[in-house]
Each structure stands twice: as C-alpha cells, then as structure tokens.
C-alpha cells in the first residue's frame, strides 16, 4: 500500500497503523468498532484479497452493532442505506466533580451542575464495509 499524506485523507481510506487496520473517520484514524472477522483487522494484508460479504449479512452485522451501542446508552437518530446515525451524551466524571465539590466547600457544585445541564451530544455514524467491519464516521 502507498504511504498516505494529509491530502489523501478521504473518509473511508484505510491505513495500517500500530499493528492493526484503521480507517479515516473524517476527524481521526479510527479503529473498527466491531467486525465479523476481528482477526483480519490485525493482519497486514490487502482487503481486496478477502471475499466480500453478502449485503444481507452486512446489514445484520450493522443491526447487531447498533443494538450493542444502544445498550451502552446511545440513541438512534437516523437510519439510511449509508449507515445508522447514533447520538450519545458526553460523559461526566461525577467522582472527580464530587471530590472537587468537597474540597472547595461546595463552591464547585455550581460548576458541576452547569456541566451536567449543558453537556453536548456526540453524533456519529456506523457504517459497514464490504468485508464486515463496522467503522465509526464523524457526523456533522
């Protein structure tokens, strides 16, 4: 495979990095969330040498991945042929904020409440490639 430069970063571009395959998500080189064959992600072998999975099996893999994400607290925003858009609230470190509130005599509690009320929603799309790997893609 050719060496990629910053200009070669198109969503869906694959790269071998630190002993496993990664894919450009639009923001970073991301690991696959799930895979039909996880061992393939750790082999430095061209993807074109593997057989492509049937569309029905890829759709089922995507459904399973979405179910797992929903169980972890995500919500489904949109489903399309391109993939499934999920949303998840940013996590708040309640233990750290609780300690800071105790150390500051309750003053930090106002900051803690403000953070909890204004936390952002992270959106991302899960899409499946022809070989059964589920990849996150940055949602706008």
Model-derived features with residue positions:
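A composition-biased, non-transmembrane "mature-region" signal
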Residues: 1-104, 109-140
């Amino acid at each position: 495979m050719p060496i990629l430069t910053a200009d070669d970063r198109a969503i869906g571009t694959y790269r071998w990095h630190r002993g496993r395959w990664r894919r450009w998500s639009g923001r970073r080189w991301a690991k696959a969330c799930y895979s039909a064959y996880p061992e393939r992600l750790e082999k430095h072998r061209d993807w074109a040498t593997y057989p492509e999975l049937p569309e029905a099996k890829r759709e089922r893999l995507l459904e399973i991945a979405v179910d797992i994400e929903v169980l972890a607290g995500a919500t489904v925003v949109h489903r399309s042929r391109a993939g499934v858009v999920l949303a998840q609230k940013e996590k708040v470190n309640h233990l750290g904020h609780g300690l800071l509130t105790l150390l500051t005599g309750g003053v930090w509690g106002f900051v803690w409440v403000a953070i909890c009320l204004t936390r952002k929603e992270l959106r991302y799309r899960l899409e499946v490639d022809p070989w059964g790997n589920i990849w996150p893609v940055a949602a706008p």
